[in-house]
């Protein structure tokens, strides 16, 4: 990380403050926030349970499990656990509403949709979808579940908007495990990229965007890039360092006069990068106002990439970035895009950094909204918990921006009109039934949101 950025980060952390006015009326605002999401739930009990569970997710509980949330309300844990793991309610309408709300709030025509997998380490073999697979959190192959997430990023902010649980092929073929975990019969094996395309088809229209981005797991298959191209989407996807590319801008080998005209050979993208002269790199000062400087260097070039079947892909733009680390080494990232070659380096950099910033979404959701705190094993419980956690994270996102951009006291009186509805669903005395270490969540959200939006000047 740039030292100037570290210094600015320390200053902002010292300045972060949550006032009592910001916390006052929090639960009535949460109730109002949840109303459009819970319209698809039938019956008052489900709505009340959803409110209780979401309240627990934004609370100061150390472990935001169903059991912990039940204890928060001094209730029998079976009621909460039944709501999450057994009650038949469809989570998809809530996620569609979430995408629409995020798209409306953060709306920018050149927004970025980001796909990113995230793993949850698990012990045993009973949790739905658990298998030995790559776990980024641990940096190795481990026993874990993997969710594929869809996020939306603009200069204003960014948020997770949808998710799918990746079900390994070994699971889809095992009838016993499927039955025990309650996997619906309609669920067939789908690759992580197919899950991403499903979410794009479902929510893409609600998220104004001109870019699709993702990490090197998403960018590796040429077939996924082809699908996006076919859909008319413009992408900037990270690719692994061993991706084979051919420089189509380089001079061709001399023709011998016989046979086919020679072409430049395919080489690894990191080897191609290593041969670049120093003057090939352009310095870009990525600024986000008061939120700290970030200096990177970048290069772009038209290339063709080798496909998995050994064929030659269409022309794409190779975009490279490097950032100097504290030890004076460089962190290198490699991307392929179907954008026009004349797209400015600064625009490619904006999209690349927006994709990286989604990691902050995971940190918030896991650290403050209990995304990974679940202790459930079956299919619907995983999706129910994940859905409500994404809603909780989005609520905290909104609260952080409300506290930063407006006078919190102006909003307190606005909750009076809904107090009667709120009293039916939550305890009258917030301080008694709801632990307000939620302040920690809002401080953290304010601090991270201060760092996230990117603009270029």
Residue ranges and their predicted role:
Residues 31, 156-181, 185, 189, ...:
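An anionic, glycine-rich sequence signature occurring as long contiguous blocks
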Residues 371-430:
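Basic, amphipathic alpha-helical segments enriched in Lys/Arg and hydrophobic/aromatic residues
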Residues 150, 199-200, 365, 391-395:
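Buried hydrophobic packing segments
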Residues 2-4, 9-213, 217-244, 251, ...:
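Conserved, well-structured functional cores that handle cations and Mg-NTP chemistry
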Residues 337, 343-352, 367-383, 403:
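Short, solvent-exposed helix-loop connector elements
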Residues 341, 354-358, 363, 367, ...:
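Short, well-ordered loop/turn and helix-capping segments at boundaries between secondary-structure elements
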Residues 146, 357, 387-390:
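Catalytic-loop motifs flanking and including active-site residues across diverse enzymes
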Residues 16-26, 111, 348-364:
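An acidic intrinsically disordered interaction segment
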